[in-house]
Amino acid sequence: MPPLIESVVLQPLIAPIDPGADGRRSRRIERRSFARIKDAIDLPLLIETQLKSFEWFKREGLRELFDEISPITDFTGKNLELHFRDYTFGEPRYDEFECRERDLTYAAPLRVRVELRILTTGEIKESEIFLGDFPIMTDNGTFVYNGAERVVVSQLIRSPGVYFKDEKEPTSGRSLHTAKLIPNRGAWLEFETNKRDVISVKVDRKRKIPVTILLRAITAWIAEENGNGRWVPDNELDKFGHNDQIIELFRHVDTVPEHPYIHATLDKDPSRNAKEALLELYKRLRPGDPPTLENARSLIESLLFSPRRYDLAKVGRYKLNKNLWERDVRRDGAKAPDLSVRVLLPRDIFRIVEQLILLNNGHGRPDDIDHLGNRRVRTVGELIQQQFRVGLLRLERVVKERMSLQDPASATPNGLINIRPVVAAMREFFGGSQLSQFMDQTNPLAELTNKRRLSALGPGGLSRDRAGFEVRDVHHSHYGRICPVETPEGPNIGLIGTMSTFARVNEMGFLETPYRKVYNSVDNVQVWKEKGILLRDVRDLRTGDLIAAKGTRVNDEIARQITIGLLRGQILREDIVDPDTDELIAEAGTEINRALAERIVELPIKHIKIRPVVSQEVDYLSADEEDRFVIVQANAPLDQHNRFLDTIVSCRFGEDFVSERVERVDYMDVSPKQVVSVSTSLIPFLEHDDANRALMGSNMQRQAVPLLRPDAPIVGTGMEYRAARDSGQVIVARRDGVVVSTTSERIVIEEDDGNQTEYRLRKFMRSNQDTCINQRPAVVRGQRVKAGDVIADSSSTDQGELALGQNVLVAYMPWEGGNFEDAILVSERLVREDIFTSIHIEKYEVEARDTKLGPEEITRDIPNVGQESLRNLDERGIIYIGAEVQPNDILVGKITPKGETDLTAEERLLRAIFGEKAREVKDSSLRVPNGVRGKVIDVKVFSRSEGAELPVGVNQTVRVLLCQKRKISAGDKMAGRHGNKGVVSRVLPIEDMPFLPDGRPVDIILNPIGVPSRMNIGQILETHLGWAAARLGFRVATPVFDGAHEDQIKDLLVQAGLPADGKVTLYDGRTGERFDNPVTVGYAYMLKLAHLVEDKIHARSTGPYSLVTQQPLGGKAQFGGQRFGEMEVWALEAYGAAYTLQEMLTVKSDDVVGRVKTYEAIVKGEPIQEAGVPESFKVLIKELQSLGLSVEVLSADEKPVELSDDLDSDIGALEGINLSGMERGEF
């Protein structure tokens, strides 16, 4: 026998808090971190995108909309004017808890102050209008809509602006460029160049026209700098838009004699001046309408220059200015329009044509549409604003119509405004939009990821069928903004992404990521004075102490303080020489002290070059800003003064990875994990996993079901606490204070200002995915808490940390083929000790409605039901709490009237004498579905008579919650965090499991063959480190890209008294013999996923049939059959199993008469008759006949066989035997 290894016992890693420990701090799991790089900044609140965006909408978004629509005038513009003034949100009628329980929407009343001006008399009528109940976001970034929690997912779309694209001409291979001008709202302009050098334009996707027609026409529009403008008078129109004027506009760019773009286009242009161009443009855009100057001018104005019809939005103007006015193409000193100008200016269009000619001539570069500088995020607030705008525009139409119908003197704001279009628009958005999603609540991580998701689908976005490879691919601009790993597998791959850990959305909607500023030089006094006012805090480069605050006005003294403060302690990169006297003040390499700094400040030098130092200042850069800078990675080695140790470092510049001298570096990453999303940053040793498996790992963590006793991972990454805290499933203290009382249902904290705050806990609530949400206090009485501390754990958290699975002892070895093809063998201990047991809660509802024949009734008095079936029902006919139910048990007794039957004369006489109505009812009770069993944990009854808000025609609703405890069993799916997934093939008795030399059996056996080809080595390192850490009694944090090294793990294994290679000899539990080779053993974190066998297993003997094909329905929900497909038929043919095959094609499928006779024969124990003709064969005959072929069926003696066409007569001949167990016609 080898030397025995001591038993590995997981002790509680944190001592429990003594209930009397007054003033003790909140409990947190302590982790030993392997990180070498400290994050430069703390993680932001992970759901701040949602919260900030909705706050913006409430504060500014609504204001913008009301300003946009005001004033609404009548069609003449002379009688009435309606102005929307200020607005307020009232208090919600019910809180979130009540809304969830009663299936209501958590909403606040929106009221608007409206002013109606009667222009003829000058009278003003004011009133406050109720604009409907507006859904309000909860503190967790969700909406409670009709009782269910929903999330509005941010949308990633192409930003408004102008985009230039290179298209190869197929015959010559010449580069011909196109330009697209995309507004936020309004007509698109698409410019193209053909091989004959003609530049054409499509206005609003109509016909192509030579661009000079548009150019001539807009020369007559005189635009002001603020975007307003006017047309020149009719009598002067002939003076504008002549050929020489157009040629003059582009003389400086159209310089290649072989390709005279403007001349070639003018040759194709039938018009000669602005007047003709306007009429020609109108003819092309509105063929069939009589062209008049008035019509032409108003059409062009409304298409391009009217703020009501055309809106670039602030972001569109920003992109337009960046692309047209900041490109270093020509320096004519022209100033870019202001960002407040949200319509087109004629000079924008001239500039686009200029740019197009330059690109065709080989100057400049086209745009990359997949670059994140060209894609922006529409967050919740903007999406709701857009939908609210739709509602307001519908409301405007109604108001205008009513204005024209009503007498102006008697009109009132209430009489003109109908809020229904606004309410309907919001209902449409929250209930039906592709971006308003039923929240994934499987576990806290699923909830958090759902809120941080970015979708390229949805209205105005891409469609998954037409999206190509490029748009789905990882792009260099995703770095630090969109996770390159986490995206769904399947048709949505690359179209749905997740924000990286540190990413945020700026006010333009572009994704930004933070970087630490690197100082290569320090500005001297005169430069600081020129800046005037500080736009940011200035901090000491060594200590991070504040030198001068943002907003400070810079004078001589402050400029001196700033420069001296920045220079102190830095090392000069070059000699400092007095320019006046040529005196050497200090040599390169000198460390600057205060005295030297004060001398340097007096010199007339603008910039003092220092050895590069990484400051504490953090700048958030968008993707197009980042492309201008050289950025070094977070793992570049620094000394204690934050100076680089190497002279050449690995950097990123644009899309290239380059090695640069440190003097050229502008910024440094703030953290190694800023590249990936929260879900991916929870995978330890991510750097050792193949990307495909890491993708599966981050997706599968979201599917982990909450277990009975959550257990935080031994090997974590340090992100577990923040992920759980920001998810919204745990309760976080709002302010500092001391816990006054704690029960399983509420926690009361006395805050430092003397106020008491009560926190309600969610107990055994059903989540959207039928998992159980149950909050448990994580604090004790007398304990001191700080704002932001977790005070109550949820279903998948342990002491405030995310705990999605369990730490189990795994062995990597084949075992009797039981773990072939990724299957997993588990020990019975996991079943017996409820290690992987989860709780699931299902909701069943029944409504008692008014029918044409009378009201339905919830009652215990159900026809043809024995006492045994009623044993668990109370006197109302509703099951009592605590009852254990099986499939087909009655949950709620309900009867529905069937209508009067025809009575005989005698019965009519009896009814007339005794006054009783012949009333027949049918049993329509709510029963437990097939395959479901569990315990009733809650019953809620909502009655109209008691004031409940119910849908029209519903008198009463009863809701029953059924709870199931599911232990791990064969067929359940399990996975690790590295994409190592498999199905449990067998639950082995503990005594049969392989055991360690100390007699301890392993919990799970995984197949080692699943590792090399998948290249997810992270699981092996996790197993080794987990074993050592469990043995030494602590938990570890090994952050992504900055985790434990192999030698560190080996050292820990040795320290724990374990073999350095992490392998040990195992013994067969059945025979006690040792296995031939040592086996890798250790602690791995395994998850039980939501794909549970109990939800999937299904069997059918008879059941419903499709009315069209008469074949069994498919799927578990329909109680359907299993498809016996083409390949299965081949198998039976190969074996010559003729009778089995015939049964499959006839009585088990669509031979209507045959299947009933077969059923009858089986029940009566008689021999089964020969099969009949299947329905599909009859269809085939009819199809051939419909093609004009005379096809008929002949018997063995060649006589025609009559096939019945009438299904009803077939069924009528069956004397009421019904196989389906359903009323005919239900399917």
UniProtKB/Swiss-Prot annotation:
Family according to the record: Belongs to the RNA polymerase beta chain family.
GO molecular function list: DNA binding; DNA-directed RNA polymerase activity; ribonucleoside binding
Enzyme class: transferase
Its EC number(s): 2.7.7.6
Organism: Chloroflexus aurantiacus (strain ATCC 29366 / DSM 635 / J-10-fl)
GO annotation terms (biological process): DNA-templated transcription
Keyword Transmembrane: no
HAMAP family recorded: RNApol_bact_RpoB (MF_01321)
GO CC terms in record: DNA-directed RNA polymerase complex
Keywords: DNA-directed RNA polymerase, Nucleotidyltransferase, Transcription, Transferase
InterPro entries xrefs: DNA-dir_RNA_pol_bsu_external_1, DNA-dir_RNA_pol_su2, DNA-dir_RNAP_su2_dom, DNA-dir_RNAP_su2_hyb_sf, RNA_pol_bsu_bac, RNA_pol_bsu_CS, RNA_pol_bsu_protrusion, RNA_pol_Rpb2_2
Function: DNA-dependent RNA polymerase catalyzes the transcription of DNA into RNA using the four ribonucleoside triphosphates as substrates.
Name of the protein described by the UniProt record: DNA-directed RNA polymerase subunit beta
Self-association and partners: The RNAP catalytic core consists of 2 alpha, 1 beta, 1 beta' and 1 omega subunit. When a sigma factor is associated with the core the holoenzyme is formed, which can initiate transcription.
Keyword check for Transcription: yes
Catalyzed reactions per annotation: RNA(n) + a ribonucleoside 5'-triphosphate = RNA(n+1) + diphosphate
